[in-house]
Amino acid sequence: MKIAVKPLPFRHYIFECLLTIAGLGLLAPLAFGQSTSGAAAMKIGIIGAGNIGSTVGTMWIKAGHQVMFSSRHPEELKPLVDRLGPLARAGTVKQALDFAEVMLMAVPYGAYGQIGRDYAKEFVGKIVLDAGNAVLARDGEIGKEAREAGVGLTTAKYLAGARIVRAFNIMGAGRLASNSHRPGEAMAIPIAGDDPEAVKIATRLVRDAGFEPVLVGDLERSRLFAQGGPLYGQEISAKEMQKRLKTFK
């Protein structure tokens, strides 16, 4: 049975996201430039400008990438975009899909089915980093399906034809922000995907965000770092995560 959840007013939600990012020192003045990986900057679209979308998007902008944040109310993203500078822009979901080489899914999982239906043509062949987590109390039947079949495989079903890589789902935005480019060994971000080229791009973007990627395997193995999985929420180095992975084989 689907459970209705009353959302916060959208303006309040964006304001809360801005406060979170500003408090963590991520809203510094930004300028155009080559990405921190040394490769050419990419065009990235983000579906969902809430906590995860705005936080990870800010990391990529600081790394020199162009980012389009999208939502049903792109005009209400103006405060975020204005603060982030010339590498940031806002648009509709369709505009973001047309703009981007790579997409980040950062919306409640219950929305995936409708998004997949509305933009089926645009998703075909698109590299999509999936940061979603299925929450039973929020996401209804699709959340239940994802918990049973695995989020990675369920995302691949609803975003048919997209080149899915699971990434950035292992913790909340505040913890991601505080661990980005941390001193000492970089924090590991587990990733999983079936498409080698998409995994290669995800690896680069995880590093550009200030983390060290650890390839867990294909989409089916992304269960290991789904919410409730053994690798979920772990603030550990890549070396430690690889050590733990060996115990799951």
Question: Can you describe what each PLM-predicted range is?
Answer:
Residues 85-88, 92-127, 131-139:
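Rossmann-like NAD(P)-binding element
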Residues 16-29:
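Bacterial N-terminal signal peptides
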Residues 1-12:
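N-terminal secretory signal peptides that target proteins for export/translocation
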Residues 91, 158-164, 182-222, 227-232, ...:
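Internal alpha-helical scaffold of NAD(P)-dependent oxidoreductase catalytic cores
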Residues 132-165, 170-174, 178-180:
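Rossmann-fold NAD(P)-binding glycine/threonine-rich loop
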Residues 32-79:
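NAD(P)+-binding Rossmann beta1-loop-alpha1 motif at the extreme N-terminus of oxidoreductases
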